C-alpha cells in the first residue's frame, strides 16, 4: 500500500529535538512510559468488551510483551489492547493536541536537574516521544480492535514521519525501537539486556494490572547466555494491586511509583492516604496528595478525579464524582466491590454508594491535612502553599464540610510574618473586648500592610488576617463567622476598636464630629458623583484619608472579578473617610470655615479623594485632571 510522508507539528518537532539530544541522566523512563501506554490500551479494551462496545475483539489473553533482538539492536513493546486507527495515529502521534504543550517545552528546557527533566515527560502525557531518547528510529504498528486494516508509523525524529495502511497486523500496538549504541558515560544502557529490562520493569511497573512478559530472544536462550534451552516467556511484574495488599507489605517506594504512574508526575507525593470500608458496601481507596500543583489546576479543562475500579477491573481514569472540586488535586485509586461493571457517568452521579464514598474520602483527606499542621509542619506548609487556594473554594461550595475545611486552613496574619495562623489560634489571641475577627483582602501581603486601612489596627496591636487569593473575596462572606466571632473586613463599614484599648471618650468624639460637620457635609455635596458619604475615620492614624465600602457592598477587587467573568456589576459609590488628627485635614477644615467659596477648596477635596483611591491600589476616575491638579499644586510650592 502507499506510504505517505508528513511533517511534524511545530511543537512536536521541538519536542523530538529535545528528546533526541537529551542529556537527561535517567533514560530508563522511556520503558516506563511505553509500558504505561500499553497498560492503558489494555484497560480500554477490557472496558469496551464489558460494555459490548468491541464485539469482535479478542480479550482472551490480554498482556504486554517485551521482545529484544541483540543482533538487530531492537526492543519492541507490544500489547494486544484497543489499538489505533489510521486517523487516531495521525491525531495522537503526528501532533501534540495538548493545551499545555508550550508550558511543557518551556519547563523541559529549564529543568536543570536530571530527575526534573525526566519526569516532565510523563507529566505532560507525551511519553511515546521518550523513545527517541534511546532510539535512532521508532516504528509503530497498530490495528484497532474489531477493524481489519492496520497502520504503520515510522520516524527517525528528523522532522518527518511516514504513514502506511497495512493489511496484516495483530490487534493492538507494537512499538519497535531501533536502539542507539550503548553509552554508559551518558547513562545510555544496553536495553537489549534482559537483566536491565527486568530491573526497569520491577522498579517502575511492578504494580501494572496486566502481565508484562519478556520473550526469549529469537533462536537463543533468552537469558543472556545462561543456558542453551529455549524458555517460555517470563512474566516480570507481580500484578498485585497495592491497595489490596496489607499495609506492612507495601514499601513507600512502591506507593510512590504507583503515584507517579497514576499522576504522570516525577516527584514523590506529599502524603499517602489509605482507606478501607467493610460491611454492607465494601471499597478500598489509596489516595495521594501531590507535593506540587500542576500548571493547569485552575483552568476549566483540568482533568480531575481519581481512578475507579470495580473488583480490580479498571472502569475510568477520572471519576469526578468520588471527590469534590476543591479536592481536585488529589490523585489515587478507589476499588469498589458492589458497583456494576457497566457503570456510566450518569449512574455515578445518582448512585448513593458513590455519594457515600465521596463523603468518607472527603472527611479523610481533610482530617489528614489538618493533622499535618501539628504532626508535620513543613509538609503542611508545602501543602498550603500549593493547594490552599483550591481548598478554600470548598468554604463557598461545600457547606456540609465547611467546619472541617476551616480546621484544615491557615491564613497569613500580622501576628507572624512567616507562620500562617489557624482561626482557632487567632481567636485565642484576641484582645480583651475584641468581638470580631478582622481581615483584609488585597493583591499581596505588602500591599495590604501598607494600606491606610491597617493603621489603627497596627497602632493598637490588633491582629488582622491578610488574604491575597481571589477566592478570599468570596469565602469570607459565605462563612460569615467562626465560633460566634464575626469575620469583619477592615476596609468595609465602620470600625470600632474602642473596646480593645483606651480611646477618646464619647464626649470628645461628639465634639470632634460637631467641629467637622460643616466640612463633611460640604465635601459630600461636592464629591457626590464619586462618593456616597464623607465621614470621620476611626481606622486612620497616619494617612489623611481612605476610601471604604459599606458593610454589605462588593469590594472593588470582587467587582473586577465578576466583570472578568462577564457579569454586569453596577458600580457602587464608596465612602471617603478623613483622619481628623492629620494636619492636612485640620488645615482644610480651617480654610473651609474661613472662606467656603474658594475654588482651591474644591480642588483640594478632589485631590484628597484621588489620593485615597490611589492608596488602596485604585485609579482616579479622571487621571488627566488629577495630574493637572497635582502639577498646579507642585508649581505653587516652588
Swiss-Prot record:
GO molecular function, one term: unfolded protein binding
InterPro entries to which the protein is assigned, alphabetical: HATPase_C_sf, Heat_shock_protein_90_CS, HSP90_C, Hsp90_fam, Hsp90_N, Ribosomal_Su5_D2-typ_SF
Keyword Chaperone set for record: yes
Spans annotated as B: 346-560
Gene Ontology cellular-component annotations: cytosol
Region of interest: C: 561-638
Region (A): 1-345
Gene Ontology biological-process entries: DNA damage response; protein folding; response to heat
Keywords, in A-Z order: ATP-binding, Chaperone, Cytoplasm, Nucleotide-binding, Stress response
Subcellular location: Cytoplasm
HAMAP family per record: HSP90 (MF_00505)
Function according to Swiss-Prot or TrEMBL: Molecular chaperone. Has ATPase activity.
Family in the record: Belongs to the heat shock protein 90 family.
Assembly description: Homodimer.
Protein name: Chaperone protein HtpG
Lineage: Bacteria, Bacillati, Actinomycetota, Actinomycetes, Kitasatosporales
